[in-house]
Design a protein with these regions (language model features):
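Extracellular adhesion/carbohydrate-recognition regions
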Residues: 79-168, 253-298, 385
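Short secondary-structure boundary/capping segments
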Residues: 185-190, 250, 260-261
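C-terminal, surface-exposed recognition/capping segments
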Residues: 55, 59, 63, 178, ...
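Short aromatic-cysteine micro-motif
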Residues: 112-238, 242, 269
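A short local loop/turn or secondary-structure capping micro-motif enriched for an aromatic residue
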Residues: 22-24, 252-255
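Compositionally biased, non-globular sequence tracts
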Residues: 1-57
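Charged, compositionally biased non-catalytic regions
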Residues: 45, 53-80
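Carbohydrate-recognition beta-sandwich/jelly-roll modules
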Residues: 72-81, 85-121, 281, 309-311, ...
Length: 392
């Protein structure tokens, strides 16, 4: 048995197993380190050639067994690691492992396991979320640093591309985004990001590497404050840059619907417009929830409303005439009061995207949400990230 932990500017890889397996993981990681350094040289004009001092690099990034076993505590009940997971094409994605947590541990709710860890009626001890907004390689999405995030794709096409990576792979779900947002709120580390054309609107010194002929930034190129826990190894770019698909929540004819728990992670869950995988989002007493829009005001109610329109405002101005732990677990509440909430409660179906984009300014944030785009939309500001669970 062998163990290894590699680190490079906040990018980490841990492996444990047979020596041959660990050696392959280390070689792959070092290859990506060199690619990253070369890309930095192209974009920034400075970087060391890793071939000049490979032994020094190896000594710097290889840690001992004790460090490998160490786990950073991010919130009560939540631990994470950064690992490389390979798909059926043999290409790795850099993924963040989150361990099972209850609503009580995360935000003071019930002792129920957070829905992100309940898939197909089974409770999972851990799930994996892409560290980076995904880029496309041969039609499959990957979590890799310093890449251009994929955009101009519909949610369903992106979801199918995620499923094509193999068992357990899926488009990030609304439940998983809720876990990220609630964790950030618990930690007091609401992420900054590219909200002002490669800069953070709150501090122009916080900047990512801008993509040519675009205001988007390369994945993971911002500072540590652009992650969910304000560490270099956190989940990057949840605030701004591009709106991200959060599969498994929608509004239809003014009513709120969701996949059960984290069943949106399963390809067999029918989340087509008329699919049977949709369940009403409810309050504490089981009443279905609706959204009324009138006079530029958004109100969450337990009854349907004749006031159905489109509106955007900040979460701090949204009226919540209901008590719903489900909404709290999905981070559909004013956890970030200045983050935007956009709702179209008119006739039709509108999917959930989250986070905001490069020009959203103060309305961007991990709690920013938009239920105002049909599932057929493919925009230059819409993209996503994959997630993974090891099926029982």
């Amino acid at each position: 048995m062998a163990k290894i932990l590699c680190n490079y500017f906040g990018l980490s890889m841990a492996a444990e197993g047979k020596s041959e397996f660990v050696g392959r993981q280390a070689a792959a990681f070092l290859g990506y380190v060199q690619q990253d350094a070369e890309r930095c040289a192209e974009n920034c004009g400075c970087a060391e050639d890793l071939n000049d001092a490979p032994e020094e690099i190896k000594r710097e990034i290889l840690r001992n067994d004790e460090e490998l076993r160490r786990r950073e505590q991010t919130a009560p009940g939540v631990e994470h690691d950064v690992v490389a997971i390979y798909d059926n094409a043999g290409i790795p994605s850099i993924m963040h492992r989150f361990r099972r947590v209850t609503n009580k541990e995360l935000f003071g709710g019930s002792d129920t396991v957070h829905p992100a860890f309940i898939i197909g009626g089974e409770v999972y001890d851990e799930i994996y979320i892409s560290v980076y907004e995904n880029t496309m390689i041969n039609g499959k999405p990957y979590s890799l640093p310093l890449q251009e995030p994929v955009t101009n794709i519909t949610m369903e096409d992106f979801a199918q591309a995620c499923f094509s990576k193999g068992e357990g792979w899926h488009c990030l779900t609304a439940a998983e985004w809720g876990l990220l947002a609630d964790t950030s709120l618990k930690l007091g580390t609401l992420p900054h990001g590219n909200t002002n054309c490669s800069h953070w609107h709150g501090d122009d010194k916080e900047q990512g590497i801008i993509i040519e002929d675009s205001y988007k930034t390369l994945t993971g190129s911002g500072p540590a404050t652009w992650t969910h826990d304000h560490t270099a190894s956190g989940v990057h770019d949840l605030c701004g840059n591009i709106w991200e698909f959060a599969r498994g929540v929608r509004i239809r004819d003014g009513a709120l619907w969701a996949a059960e728990n984290n069943d949106a992670a399963l390809p067999e869950t029918d989340l087509t417009e008329c699919g049977d995988g949709w369940k009403p989002i409810t309050d504490a007493e089981g009443h279905p929830l609706y959204v009324a829009v009138e006079d530029n005001k958004i109100t969450f109610n337990t009854y349907p409303s004749v006031h159905r329109d489109y509106c955007g405002c900040v979460w701090g101005n949204v009226r919540m005439n209901c008590d719903s732990e489900q909404l709290r677990a999905l981070a559909l509440f004013a956890g970030e009061e200045k983050a935007g909430c956009y709702v179209d409660s008119t006739e039709g179906e509108y999917i959930l995207v989250r986070g905001g984009r490069w020009g959203s300014g103060g309305s961007a944030g991990v709690f920013a949400s938009s239920l105002s785009s049909p599932r057929s939309y493919a925009r230059g500001s819409f993209g996503g990230r994959s997630a993974y669970f090891k099926k029982h």
